[in-house]
Amino acid sequence: MPKRTDVHKIMVIGSGPIIIGQAAEFDYSGTQACLALREEGYEVVLVNSNPATIMTDTEIADKVYIEPLTVESVSRIIRQEFPDAILPTLGGQIGLNLAIALAKTGILEELGIKLLGTQLDAIDQAEDRQRFKDLMQELNEPVPDSKTVETVQEALDFAAEIGYPVIVRPAFTMGGTGGGLCDNPEQLKEIVANGLELSPATQCLIEKSIMGYKEIEFEVMRDADNNAMVVCSMENFDPVGIHTGDSIVFAPTQTLSDREYQMLRNCSLKLIRALKIEGGCNVQLALDPNSYRYYVIEVNPRVSRSSALASKATGYPIAKLAAKIAVGLTLDEIKNPVTGTTFAEFEPALDYVVAKIPRWPFDKFTRANRRLGTQMKATGEVMAIGRSAQEALQKAVRSLEIDEKDLISAKAQSATDDEVEEKLFHAQDDRLFYIAEAFRRGYTIEEVHELTKINLYYLDIVKQIVELESELSQNKEDLDVLKRAKRYGYSDYTIAKLWGTTEDEVRNLRKEHKLLPVYKMVDTCAAEFDSSTPYFYSSYDLENESKKSDKKSVLVIGSGPIRIGQGVEFDYATVHSVKAIQKLGYEAIVMNSNPETVSTDFSISDKLYFEPLTLEDVLNVIDLEQPMGVIVQFGGQTAINLAAGLEAHSVKILGTTVEDLDRAEDRELFDQTIKNLGLKQPIGKTATTQEQVIACAEEIGYPVLVRPSYVLGGRAMEIVNNEQELLDYLAQNAPAEIDHPILVDAYLSGLECEVDAICDGKDVLLPGIMEHIEHAGVHSGDSMAVYPPQSFDENIKQQIVDATEKLAVALKCVGIMNIQFIIHNNEAYVLEVNPRASRTVPFLSKITGIEMAQVATRVILGESLAEQGYQSGLYRESDMVHVKAPVFSFSKLADVDSFLGPEMKSTGEVMGSDYTFEKALYKAFTGAKMELPDNGNVLLTIEDKDKDAVLPLAKRFSKIGYRMFATEGTSQFLRENGLFVQTVDKLGKDTGNETSLHDLIVNDGVDLVINTMSHDQEVASDGFVIRQLAIEHNIALLTSLNTADALLKALENRSFATNSL
C-alpha cells in the first residue's frame, strides 16, 4: 500500500520529562519516528516539554515546540500550525493520554485532524481494563479472574469473593503507577484509594494474583494490510509479581519449548490483529511453569520500554518502522535498514543472548523501601550481549556501575542464613547477589527455587557461575579454567580477586597466550543474509567480525544507565560529540551499555560497541580499533572515572588532561589554584578520619556541608547543623578514608548560579549564566533555574565571567566545563568546578543556539573558538526568559523523603519559555504537572525559623484569593499579622479544631502543601509524614520558600488584582 498523500504536516507528541516508568526510551523512539517521517517527505511538528532530549533538537523536526504537554498548550499549537494529522503512539503513556484528552475536547474533529497509527478506539480497548477483558473473553483468550472497580468498597467485595492475594492495576497509567500486590483488606484499601486517584479514568482492575508464573513478553508489529510479525520474544528472570521494568530480562526466551513458544506467539499475533493496532505493540503473558496454561496480562498499544530493549537486542528499529506504518506503508514494502536487502516482514533471528538488568536509585535513597512488586522503581537499565546466558548476565552486572562488579557481594557474604533466605523470599533489587551467595553456602537449586519461584534453568545459570568461582580460586593461572571463565563473562577484575593478584597481571597473562575477545555483529538475521551493521558485542569466541577501518577514529565513552544525577542529558552531549567528530572527517566510535538511548542507535555513529563501561572492556576495544584518542568529557562521572586508568595504559585522553581533571577534583590542588587566582570560595577542609571530620566542623563552625570527594548528583551530601547530626551522617555513609576523603565546607546562604563554559586553552566562551531559584543548600539538579539571570546586576555578572575565564585557563581546560557559584554579600564565591559536560548542556544549547557539545568537541580536536566564529566572554543574552524546572518520581518510591537538600532527587526536567519571567515560570510549573487553580487552598507547615519569611508569601496567597490552613503555631503567628487562617490539628493531636492536618490532606481539602519542617533524619518525623501524605494523595508539594515565591509570581501573573481605592 503506498504511503498516504492526504496528509502533509504531522504533529508528533513527545513523552515529557523523565520519570520512573517513562525514561530515555521515548527520546530514542521519538527521534527515530521524526526522522523516518521526514525521510518519507512529510513536514513534522514536534511538541515536548523536555529540553534534555535529542528529539527536541531543531534538526530532528521541521518545527520544535518545547511547551507543556497539556490540552490547553497543545491545542494552542494545533490552532497555530493546523497539522493534518497527529501521531500519538511514540510519546509513551503521556502522549497517549494527551491524544485521548484532545479528542474528547472536540478540537481534532473540528479541524479535521486525523490520528495516525493505532486508532483511539483500539487504544481505549487495550487500556480500558473492562473493555480489554471483554475482548479477551470474545477471543477466547484466558485472563486472570478480575473486575474493574471505581470505588474501594467494590474492590473489597470482589477480593473477598475470589480470595487474596490480589493485584491492583490502575487504568491508563504506566510503570505500574499506583498499583501493587495486596495480601489483606488493609493493604487493598490503601492501594486502591491511591490507584483511583492516580488513574485518569478513576478505575482500577482487581485481579487474582498469578504470582510464580513465568512472565513472557512478545514485541509485535502490524500494518494496515493485517500483516503481523514478532520482532522479539523476551523472558523475565523474575516470575510474575515483579514489574517487568524491575525484572532481569533475557532475549530471546530461554526456557520455552517449541510448542509453548508457538502457542504464545500465535496468541500475541491474534491480539494485535483483533485490536487493529498499526505499528508496534507489547504483549505480556503469564505461563504456568508446570502445564500449558497461560494468561494474557496486558497489551501496551504503543512503543514502550520493552520495544526500545527489543530494538537494541535485535537491531530491528521498531519505532522507525512504526512511524512508516502509521503513514500507510506495509511491512512487505519497507526495507529492513539493517540488512538493506530483506524486507521488514522477516522476523529477526538471534544467534546470541541478551540480558537486561534494571538500575535502581537505592544508592542515593538509602532509606527507601527496596521491596520489588508491581510498581516500578528502577530509573534506568543496562543491556549486555553474549554467546551464552552466563556471559550476558555477568557483563550486565558489571555494566550497572554499582558497588558490586560481579556476583560476589560483601553484604551478602556477611549475612546470616536467615537473612539470605529472607532476601530470597522477599525480592529486593539485590536478590541476584543473595541467590549466588545461597549457592556458595550449599543450598540446592530446588531450595532456592522454593524461596524465589525463579525458573530452575535461570538458577542453574547462576549456580554454574558460582561453581566456576571456586574452580578459579583453586586453579590459579590455569589457562583452561581461565578460558572457560572468560567465556562465562568473568572479568579480569573478578579473576584477579579470586587469584589474589592484580587486574593488569590477569590481562597480561591473557594477552601473552592470545586469549582475546572477538567482536560479533548484531545483524537481525543470525548471519543468514549479508549484513553490514556497524553494531558489535564482545565474546570469547572464534571469528572476529569487526574490522578496523583506514580512517582516523575517535572513541567516545557514553554515560551508562540512566540514574539520578546522571540522566539523558549526558547522552545528549555524547550524540552531539559524535556529530562533530563525523563533520571533521574522523570515524566516530561509541561505547555504551544503555538500551534506552539515542547514542546506542547504531545509525548514529560509525561504529557502536554495546559493552560494559569498565576499564577492561574499554581497553579491549581500543586494542582492536587503535583510535587516535578517547573523549571522556560527555559521559558524566562514568567516563571521567575511566580517564586515569586509560592514561595509565598509555591511551591518549583528548581534551583536558588527566592531571588537570584531577586538579579540579582534588580538594587541596583546587584550593591552591583558587588562592593563586585571588578568587573567593567558602572555607573548606578535607578529612580522612572521623575525628578529623568532627574537628574540621568545629573549626569552621556549624552549619557545615559534608560530602565525599569525587561524586556526582550530590550523593551522600548533607547540611548538618550540630555534632549529633554529623555523627548520624558518618554512621549512615562510608567513614572517611585516605582513598575516600570527606569534604567539610562552611555553608553560606545566598543566591546560587552556574555557568557552562568552553575553553580552547586561550579563549573562554560562556554561552550563558543560569540563576537558581532555590537558595544555596538545594542541589543544582533539583533547583529551578532561570536564564538570563533575573537578580544579578552587571557587576555580579562580570565577577562570574572573570572568575570563569581565570579558572578555565588556570585549570588548562580544553573542551567543556561547569562552574557553580554562590552570591554572598554581593560577591561571587566559587562552590565547585566540574571539568566535563554537565546536565545543563542541552538546556543552554537549546536556548542560545550554540551546539555546546559540538563546539567543545571541535575544540578538543584542535579547532579554536575563534576559528569557529566565537569570541571570549559571555554570549549575548536572549530576549526570551527560559526556566528549567525539576521533575520528581516520589510517588513511585515509598519512604524517600521529598524534602529538598544537597542530595539530588529529581529524575527529569521540563522547560518553560516566554517573554516575561512570570509567564516562563507558569509554563515550567505547568510542564512539571503543578497545575493550580486561580483560587484554591494552601496548607502551611513551617519551621519556626522560616515564619518571618513566610509572612509576605502568605499575604500574597491571601491577595489572590487562596484560603490558608496552618497548625497552631504558624496559624497564630499569621493571624497576629492580620491574616485569616484556619487552624488544623497537628498529626496525632485532637485539640478540638474543625479538621485535622491528616484529614485535610487525605480528603483532598488542599491544592498545595508548603512544608519547610526540616528532615531531622527521623523517618517518622511530622515533616516527613506530611510530605508523604501529600505525595500519596497527588497534592502539589513545595519544601522551599524560594520555590513558593516563584509559584506565586506565576499565579499572580495569571489572576487579576482586586484592590479597594
From Swiss-Prot:
Organism per entry: Ligilactobacillus salivarius (strain UCC118) (Lactobacillus salivarius)
A GO molecular-function descriptor: carbamoyl-phosphate synthase (glutamine-hydrolyzing) activity
Broad enzyme group: ligase
Annotated segments matching region Carbamoyl phosphate synthetic domain: 547-929
Name of the protein: Carbamoyl phosphate synthase large chain
Positions bound to Mg(2+) 4: E832, N834
Binding site for Mn(2+) 2: E298, N300
Pfam (any one): CPSase_L_D3
Binding of Mn(2+) 4, residues: E832, N834
InterPro entries named among the record's database cross-references: ATP-grasp, ATP_grasp_subdomain_1, CarbamoylP_synth_lsu, CarbamoylP_synth_lsu_oligo, CarbamoylP_synth_lsu_oligo_sf, CbamoylP_synth_lsu-like_ATP-bd, CbamoylP_synth_lsu_CPSase_dom, MGS-like_dom
Pathway(s) annotated for this protein in UniProt: Amino-acid biosynthesis; L-arginine biosynthesis; carbamoyl phosphate from bicarbonate: step 1/1; Pyrimidine metabolism; UMP biosynthesis via de novo pathway; (S)-dihydroorotate from bicarbonate: step 1/3
Gene that encodes the chain: carB
Catalysis performed (reactions): hydrogencarbonate + L-glutamine + 2 ATP + H2O = carbamoyl phosphate + L-glutamate + 2 ADP + phosphate + 2 H(+)
PROSITE patterns assigned to the protein according to its UniProt record, in alphabetical order: ATP_GRASP, CPSASE_1, CPSASE_2, MGS
Record's keyword annotation contains Ligase: yes
Complex and partners: Composed of two chains; the small (or glutamine) chain promotes the hydrolysis of glutamine to ammonia, which is used by the large (or ammonia) chain to synthesize carbamoyl phosphate. Tetramer of heterodimers (alpha,beta)4.
Chain residues that bind Mg(2+) 3: Q820, E832
Family to which the UniProt record says this protein belongs: Belongs to the CarB family.
